[in-house]
Amino acid sequence: MAAQPTIREVLFNPVFQNNPIGLQILGICSALAVTSNLKTATVMAIALTLVTGFSNLFISMIRRQIPSSIRMIVQMVIIASLVIVVDQVLKAYAYSLSKQLSVFVGLIITNCIVMGRAEAFAMANPPLVSFFDGIGNGLGYSAMLLVLGFIRELFGAGKLYGISVLPTVNDGGWYQPNGLLLLPPSAFFLIGLIIWALRTWKKDQVEAPAYRMAPQVSSKEAY
C-alpha cells in the first residue's frame, strides 16, 4: 500500500513541482481571460482556491457513502454549491469585480483542476489531507495567475491593482503601454514562456519525445 502523502507535500508540491497550469496544462481558459489585471486575477485565484479546498474536504468526508455510478454527479453538485456561494458573495460585496469576471466564476464548476482533484485525490484520501491538497493546487493555480496578471497589467497599462506605476505618455510620462499584453492571446505566449522557464529550471519536468527520427543512412549502406 502506498504511503499517504503528507500535508506539506500536497500543500507545496503543486506550486513548483506539479503546477496545475505549468505542468499539467489545466485551467488555461480562465488564465487567459482574467489576468489582464491583478484585481481580477487575485479574486479568481482566491475563489478557485477556496472552492477546490472545500470541495475536496466535503467530497472526502462522504467518499465512502458515494455510489461509484453517480460519484461525478455528487462531485458536481458539491462544487456547484460552493461556486454559487462564492458568486453570491462577490455580487454582494464586490459587484464591479463580479461583473469583470463575468461567467468565469461560474465556470469554476467545470474547471479541470477542481474536478480532477476531487476525482483523483479526495475520493481516495482522508478529509484533512484532501483539504490541503485542494488548497495547494489552488495556490499553484494562483501563483501562475498572479504572475500573468502582474506582467500583463504592468507592461500593458503601466499599473498594478489599478495604481499607476509606470508613468504613461498619455499622462505626460515616458512609458508607452503595450496594448497587446491586454489581449487574451498574449497570455498564451506568456504561459508558454513560463512553462519553458520552469522546465529549464527543473529538468525532470521535461517530457520524453513522443517519437525519435530514424538515423539517416546512405544509399550504399541501405544496399
From Swiss-Prot:
InterPro entries in alphabetical order: NqrD, NqrDE/RnfAE
Compartments, record wording: Cell inner membrane
Source species, domain of life: Bacteria
Keywords: Cell inner membrane, Cell membrane, Ion transport, Membrane, NAD, Sodium, Sodium transport, Translocase, Transmembrane, Transmembrane helix, Transport, Ubiquinone
Keyword flag Metal-binding: no
Keyword Cell inner membrane: yes
One GO term (biological process): sodium ion transport
Enzyme Commission identifier(s): 7.2.1.1
Function comment: NQR complex catalyzes the reduction of ubiquinone-1 to ubiquinol by two successive reactions, coupled with the transport of Na(+) ions from the cytoplasm to the periplasm. NqrA to NqrE are probably involved in the second step, the conversion of ubisemiquinone to ubiquinol.
Protein name: Na(+)-translocating NADH-quinone reductase subunit D
Organism in which the protein naturally occurs: Pseudomonas paraeruginosa (strain DSM 24068 / PA7)
Lineage: Bacteria, Pseudomonadati, Pseudomonadota, Gammaproteobacteria, Pseudomonadales
